[in-house]
Each structure stands twice: as structure tokens, then as C-alpha cells.
């Protein structure tokens, strides 16, 4: 996953805006709702890469 990628969290697509370093315990990501622009923080383990196929 890279900044700017579309990812899936709780069944919805979000834009990945930030990642905590791999060395951080309980790593989190920052996500942006592409429809509203609202930002969310989510556990890294709950976010998956979007597959287009």
C-alpha cells in the first residue's frame, strides 16, 4: 500500500493518506472518505488493498 492508493476498510473504499512506521506497535493508518473528504484513523490490520480484478 502506498499513499494515495484506494483501500478497503469496513467494506468501503477510502484514499490512504498516511501510515505509521512499521516499528510502531498497533500501527494505524489515516484514511480519507473520497465522497466527503472526512479523515479517519483506522487500525492497519483492518485495512486491505483494493483489488480491481
Predicted regions and their residues:
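Acidic surface patches and DE-rich sequence motifs
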Residues: 8-9, 22, 33-34
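Short coil-to-beta transition motif at edge beta-strands of beta-rich domains
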Residues: 1-10
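Coiled-coil-like amphipathic alpha-helices with heptad-repeat character
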Residues: 22-23, 45
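Short aromatic-glycine-enriched beta-strand elements
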Residues: 25-30
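Short beta-strand-centered aromatic/proline hotspots
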Residues: 12-22
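Intrinsically disordered, low-complexity, charged/polar segments
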Residues: 32-53
Amino acid at each position: 500500500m502506498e499513499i494515495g492508493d484506494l483501500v478497503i476498510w469496513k467494506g468501503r473504499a477510502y484514499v490512504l493518506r498516511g501510515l505509521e512506521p512499521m516499528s510502531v506497535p498497533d500501527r494505524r493508518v489515516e484514511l480519507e472518505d473520497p465522497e466527503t473528504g472526512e479523515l479517519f484513523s483506522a487500525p492497519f490490520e483492518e485495512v486491505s488493498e483494493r483489488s480491481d480484478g
